[in-house]
Amino acid sequence: GYLGGYAGYAAAPAAYAAAPAAYAAPAYAAPAVVKTAYAAPAIVKAAAPAVDYYSYPKYAFEYGVNDPHTGDVKRQWEERDGDVVRGEYSLLEPDGTTRTVTYTADAHNGFNAVVHRSGPSAHPAPAPAVAVPAVAKYVAAAPAVVKSVGYGGYGYH
């Protein structure tokens, strides 16, 4: 036992209780299984989606640019009637030719474009080679070795 100044630890308890004679685990009951009947979903044929226009799509536009200062030369036109779109645009290529693209688009054929080039192709002559004078090689003298003068007052020699 404990021999210090607290008497509550000086001796063992006067009696011990005996272990229980038998142990019964709690009973477990599995939840009841409820059978649910399922029916196959009914097959419904979907109707083709109806085209619902707020207003019938119909437009036409055309524009062109001819800026000699920047060299920007182009034009375009397009028209739509329902689900059919037709149009054409052209632009001046850097080599001087004109590229023209004619296109159509509809629900049956999709988008189709035909590209044409017209006009003479003008390529600038290559710039003449410029002769660059050779740079003279720089030659430097090797550094001279100089014996150090000691610093006698500071203990360096």
Curated annotation (Swiss-Prot):
Residues in Chitin-binding type R&R domain copies: 56-127
Sequence repeats: 11-14, 18-21, 24-27, 29-32, 39-42, 47-50, 141-144
Keyword field: Cuticle, Repeat
Pfam family, one: Chitin_bind_4
Example of a GO cellular component annotation carried by this entry: extracellular matrix
Signal peptide extent: none
GO MF terms held by the record: structural constituent of cuticle
Protein's job: Component of the cuticle of migratory locust which contains more than 100 different structural proteins.
Protein name: Cuticle protein 19
Organism: Locusta migratoria
